[in-house]
């Protein structure tokens, strides 16, 4: 797989409902992954379907997902496990001329494949990548993770070669109806000012303001106003 090759459409990844909304440009996949914060990971555990939320980061051609060694998914993944990671972002409410045609603007990516645990030095780098993705600059401001903390954390690595991306943007379909307002209401995730813990004796972390600005930029980038 290359980072510029289009996403292949297979029986597994093909969109059937509103199929014209499917995107095969790999840059669209990366846009969704960089804009989201949580992956909802679906898998089968003890014969039952499960979905859990996981923090993640992108590293090269893989999705790195953060979890606890006590979780059932970790036990299943020791030799690799098939799963689906879904990242969804709601970008707005679409007000059509009737409720049936009213909908959401959204970006959604589903990544499917065999996930394997990350170990050794690669695990350390993966944890750092997820930290830098969620809290840029924080890694260098705090004490390094202990061996016990590392042992209690597991990272799954999922290839990005099997993915389905679906994006809807803009106004409702159909012609306007006289006397009925139609259009859409944009939505973004906003990162607010930090709230210090009671009793701390420290200046505000140097990484905070740049991190907040960066996360807000990612949230608004699709609007074309950042």
Predicted regions located by residue number:
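General beta-strand recognition
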Residues: 62-64, 84, 166
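A generic structural motif
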Residues: 63-68, 156-157
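An N-terminal domain-cap segment
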Residues: 6-64, 75
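C-terminal edge-of-domain segments
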Residues: 1-12, 123-226
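Short helix-to-loop capping/linker segments positioned immediately adjacent to catalytic or ligand/cofactor-binding
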Residues: 40-44, 97-99, 115-119, 139-146
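Short, structured beta-strand-loop surface elements
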Residues: 8, 70-129
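A generic structural signal for short beta-strands and their flanking turns/coil linkers
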Residues: 37, 52, 61, 79-83, ...
């Amino acid at each position: 797989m290359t980072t510029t090759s289009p996403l292949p459409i297979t029986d597994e990844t093909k969109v059937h409902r509103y199929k014209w909304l499917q995107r095969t440009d790999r840059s669209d996949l990366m846009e969704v992954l960089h804009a989201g914060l949580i992956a909802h990971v679906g898998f089968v555990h003890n014969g039952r379907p499960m979905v859990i939320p996981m923090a993640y980061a992108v590293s090269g051609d893989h999705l790195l997902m953060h979890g606890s060694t006590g979780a059932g998914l970790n036990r299943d993944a020791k030799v690799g496990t098939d799963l689906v990671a879904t990242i969804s972002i709601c970008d707005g409410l679409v007000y059509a001329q009737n409720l049936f045609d009213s909908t959401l603007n959204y970006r959604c990516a589903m990544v499917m494949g065999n996930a394997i645990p990350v170990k050794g030095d690669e695990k350390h780098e993966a944890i750092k990548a997820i930290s830098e993705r969620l809290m840029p600059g924080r890694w260098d401001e705090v004490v390094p993770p202990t061996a016990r903390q590392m042992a209690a954390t597991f990272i799954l690595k999922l290839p990005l070669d099997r993915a389905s991306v679906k994006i809807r943007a803009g106004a409702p379909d159909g012609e306007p109806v006289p006397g009925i307002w139609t259009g859409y209401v944009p939505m973004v995730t906003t990162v607010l000012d930090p709230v210090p813990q009671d009793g701390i004796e420290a200046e505000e972390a140097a990484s905070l303001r740049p991190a907040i600005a960066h996360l807000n930029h990612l949230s608004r980038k699709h609007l074309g106003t950042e």
